[in-house]
Amino acid sequence: MQFDNIDSALMALKNGEPIIVVDDENRENEGDLVAVTEWMNDNTINFMAKEARGLICAPVSKDIAQRLDLVQMVDDNSDIFGTQFTVSIDHVDTTTGISAYERTLTAKKLIDPSSEAKDFNRPGHLFPLVAQDKGVLARNGHTEAAVDLAKLTGAKPAGVICEIMNDDGTMAKGQDLQKFKEKHQLKMITIDDLIEYRKKLEPEIEFKAKVKMPTDFGTFDMYGFKATYTDEEIVVLTKGAIRQHENVRLHSACLTGDIFHSQRCDCGAQLESSMKYINEHGGMIIYLPQEGRGIGLLNKLRAYELIEQGYDTVTANLALGFDEDLRDYHIAAQILKYFNIEHINLLSNNPSKFEGLKQYGIDIAERIEVIVPETVHNHDYMETKKIKMGHLI
């Protein structure tokens, strides 16, 4: 499929045009027509009903839903993706409420600041959906995408969406969506691209604290940050004056290795080696909450169970339904930019960290190898990292 950039899609939306938004292939893997309520014209919903044919819904922010008393359709939401349907509505000025014109009126009244809860009949023919406050950074759904896109165009936080169906009633995917795009000359974007757009556009960290931290390897300055959209807590150790071409270690949290000194991995040894190096040469350690390459502690323990049955660290993750590495280094890049650092010497054996930082504007001037000894318990793990994951060890 041929996707457009987010800026061109925003321009189309602001011109009153709908666009196609495609979600993750591991999710619904479908395309929705999306329009911004404030900018859409009288033909938008008619076009959705005639050409897309899916259910026409109206994503709104939580503030709008609460102000208009749009309560959840059911108390026990068992939808597989947790879509927050409210009770359906018609505006009181409609007749049957089902015509394209009347559904447009109902949608427009949702964003009218003078509208009140009593102005909507329930049930009706338009289906509001409530978006998560943090948008696609909290949930990668079409609901959140529509509200985020509305905000990015400067409009009130509401949209109208409709799934795209083929002529035979099946859901349009892949090349079907490409043909739909070309036939109707529409912009098409992915939710993944919208997520990356927002990450680059908006600050994601908040500085919270700074203290002196004496350790077995020297005394460091410890900074505490909070991730704005996930509430994760990140700590940073620094030694000496902070400067360009700083020596930097990105260390993914590993409770078993860092705290309990597990010999299944080399994480604890790499952390200690990096602390010694930074203490001697100056630099920074960014300690990221990315347990188990992003799958979390309990899932890492489940992966260990599979490793005991003959899997390796990569195939175990895959068997559990995860990619081999879920880590993203945008938060690390944001922290570096907080300290006005754009060029670093990276303490790492992992090429994916180089690429992960480069895509967020961080230049890697030099790689500093982190050398730690193998143990009888982590030999296979180290070999897998080298052979399957390309680690430079």
Swiss-Prot record:
Residues flagged as site, Essential for DHBP synthase activity = H125, E163
One cellular component term (GO) for this entry is:
cytosol
Return the annotated region ranges for GTP cyclohydrolase II.
201-393
User: Which reaction does this chain catalyze?
Assistant: D-ribulose 5-phosphate = (2S)-2-hydroxy-3-oxobutyl phosphate + formate + H(+); GTP + 4 H2O = 2,5-diamino-6-hydroxy-4-(5-phosphoribosylamino)-pyrimidine + formate + 2 phosphate + 3 H(+)
Which intervals of the chain are annotated as region DHBP synthase? 1-200
Per UniProt, Mg(2+) 2 binds at E28, H142
Annotated protein name in UniProt: Riboflavin biosynthesis protein RibBA
What organism is this sequence from? Answer: Staphylococcus aureus (strain COL)
Q: Pfam families, alphabetically?
A: DHBP_synthase, GTP_cyclohydro2
Taxonomic path:
Bacteria, Bacillati, Bacillota, Bacilli, Bacillales
Binding-site list for D-ribulose 5-phosphate: R27, E28, D32, R139, N140, G141, H142, T143, E163
Transcription as UniProt keyword? no
Q: Where does Zn(2+) bind?
A: C254, C265, C267
- SUPFAM superfamilies linked: RibA-like, YrdC/RibB
Q: How is the cofactor bound?
A: Binds 2 divalent metal cations per subunit. Magnesium or manganese. Binds 1 zinc ion per subunit.
Active site feature: D325 (proton acceptor), R327 (nucleophile)
